Amino acid sequence: MSDRDIRCSFCGRTQKEVKKLIAGPGVYICDECVKLAYDIIEEDEEEDVTEEFEDFVLPKPHEIKNFLDQYVIGQERAKKILSVAVYNHYKRIFMKSKITEDVEIQKSNILLIGPTGVGKTLLAETLAKFLKVPFAIADATTLTEAGYVGEDVENILLRLIQNADWDIKRAEKGIVYIDEIDKISRKSENPSITRDVSGEGVQQALLRIVEGTIANVPPQGGRKHPYQEFIQINTKDILFIAGGSFEGIEKIVEKRLDVSSIGFGAQIEPKNRKSLTQILNHIIPEDLIKFGMIPEFVGRFPVVAVLEPLSEEALLKILTEPKNALVKQYKALLSIEGVEIDFTDEALRSIVKEALEKATGARGLRAVMEELMLDLMYELPNLGIKRFTITPELVYNRGKISQELLKKLAG
């Protein structure tokens, strides 16, 4: 058979009519038919995703924020930033057909910056709950790069797959929250010559799954070895939210702002008038790089939201107002036993003050409440008391509340 007679087995074009003609056992396929076949497969995959999430209704940013408001007190700016970022992320996935072919919208992962106990994890958790997508939490401090003792980054994806009931398609549209991300900063701005097990190496390992790749996940967890089978998962549509306190980064920001503000007409605000949040709201990627995050990693988290430290008033609202407020939870638990409890305003203030001393934000509230309620939940059902008021005296005596004290206060 001459070159002139060689044709594509699918469209019939000759070798001269196409750019490439690929030969197989007794058949030929041209480059145009390869592209057409690829487009058909891609279209089918998109249809599969649409069918999998056909009941998914993308809420508007206002609706997302309204739901967050039910569980997270304060943090208005952070909630607004998150709502828009999440809306755009899922719009990019589910509305591809409405985006013109000459525009490629990249994934916008989110970085949350704020002190311990201000609601970083709760925000990510609540978003996943509202959107009804799989969710997984990872602690960056437990991760190590391949070859070192610790946890492989792929195990984060295994948790997501498990939480999606092993449905890979659902997991590929999930949310992953990585806590303590600031703890894997490298020790200096200069790239390390030696291995940095807990810093730069982990950032490099995370970078691959965060930016979008086909990851091989060991189904049993643990370290990968060459003889085991893997689950493959595409991470390009997984939303990664990273959180950290980034203690000390405000000094980097202040230094840059002070230097840049020196000049004719510059408005210099005294340092003592700037709150920590005001300073952190001026964070730029270069500040994160100076802190120890590698440039490529910073580039994969273009959306940055700063969370404010919690005031006494905010903690009081957290204690009583959200759907999952601790006071509401304990009241509901004791009501099942037929016991109605109430808290005086002074008792609530006492709980907040005790929590503030712990300097762990909303986590301090839980610690104080659990210590207070342990004895009450143990003793009250046995004492036949049907109604009980919690006072500051009980708050300050928590951990050593006796039956006699309870009877006296109930009496």
From Swiss-Prot:
Keywords: ATP-binding, Chaperone, Metal-binding, Nucleotide-binding, Zinc
Keyword Nucleotide-binding tagged: yes
One GO term (biological process): cell division
Signal sequence, renumbered to the chain: none
Binding residue positions for Zn(2+): C8, C11, C30, C33
Pfam families: AAA_2, ClpB_D2-small, zf-C4_ClpX
Purpose of the protein: ATP-dependent specificity component of the Clp protease. It directs the protease to specific substrates. Can perform chaperone functions in the absence of ClpP.
Family to which the UniProt record says this protein belongs: Belongs to the ClpX chaperone family.
Protein's name in the database: ATP-dependent Clp protease ATP-binding subunit ClpX
